[in-house]
Amino acid sequence: MKLRNLFLLIALSLPVCLSAQTSKQIYLQRADSLLQQILTLYKVEKYGLLTETYPRKPEQRITYTANTGVVVNQQEVSFLWPYSALVSGCVSLYKVSGQKKYRKLMDRQIKPGLDLYWDSTRIPHCYQSYPAFAGHNDRYYDDNDWVAIDFCDYYERTGDKEYLEKAIQLHDYIYSGWSEELGGGIYWCEQKKESKNTCSNAPATVLCMKLFKLTKDAKYLEQAKKTYQWTRDNLCDPSDFVYWDNKNLQGKVDPAKYTYNSGQMIQAGVLLYQATGEKRYLKEAQQTAEGSCRFFLKVQPIAIGEMKFFPGTSWFNVILFRGLKALYLVDRNEAYIKTMIENVDYAWNYTRDENGLFSNDWSGHREEQFKSLLENACMIELFAEISELQFKHNKQ
């Protein structure tokens, strides 16, 4: 056996007994080091934004245009979606650590960068998929979901009303995408109203629940219930309680399944249970958690044998983790959440490149030359959120 494999055997077979404080520090250090590396490697000095990949793909082009979808320009900076993963990471780091440097970074650098994506020329106002300096681009309801959720979390920690007001404004934009076609539901893209997607409706439910908690306005709770039920009735596979991707306006379901869709419905169910006390929401969250782990976890070979891994879709998996963590904090079932933690511990220890960056595949079987901002920035949130959890042992 090679020496490296021997070390791997030791690392994976022996539980590392650590104090909760030590474990928290380890995960926070991982999150912080990745944050600093991303801000350095992906930086676009001209705009104060970040590139889509590192190294930058020379052929990268803007494809999300508001009218035709035709490539119009070379892509200088990332789309909103990857940039929002950085927002999520910074919010999580500040939320769990309380360190002022993260609030300073958010308020003085990351939020001003995010503002460059703001479209103030079309009503309702919202964030568009590419910075406004490049003209009009597509506006996605789910892109705005993720940002609004982050703003709710940040407001809850800081008390800065600017973020709550912006979250409410984004909520109003998102629900402008609700229509009675298919009996309800929110479209995916404002410029392509062709389908109602789990990825626009499930996080909208989570957003409504967060706004209900922050404002005590019952309209958000009722809206959350309605959106949750529409999504469950139309997009939940009754055979395993895992969520399909979308339903088009002809009523045809796209049966593709992605971890983040189920993750947001798990989180939505937990939040509804906590607010209403209705046990069916908790039961449905537990059913989807169990079904998701059965469906998505696949055995992969590693140097010393085999290990179960979630798919090679890091950001999607992080959104699943949001749901699994919310569920764990209620029912204290460690099984699902610890599998994800073991995955990312393995990825940290054995699959990063010379710059400390990740490919999509946590098992390390598929290496990528161009490291995605989306798939790396999301890991900041994941490590920060793991740092709050206390188990008897973690394999780090």
What annotation goes with each model-predicted range?
Residues 23-84, 96, 101, 112-142, ...:
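CBM-like carbohydrate-recognition segments
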Residues 84-100, 146-160, 203-217, 264-278, ...:
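Well-ordered alpha-helical scaffold segments within catalytic/enzyme domains
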Residues 198-204, 208-212, 220-269:
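Active-site cradle of extracellular carbohydrate-active enzymes
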Residues 37, 108, 112, 169-173, ...:
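The canonical alpha-helical register within tetratricopeptide repeats
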Residues 258-297:
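Oxyanion-binding "anion nests"
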Residues 100-211, 218-225:
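Extended ligand-binding groove/face enriched in aromatic
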Residues 188-193, 215, 247-255, 276:
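Surface-exposed cleft-lining segments at the edges of enzyme active sites
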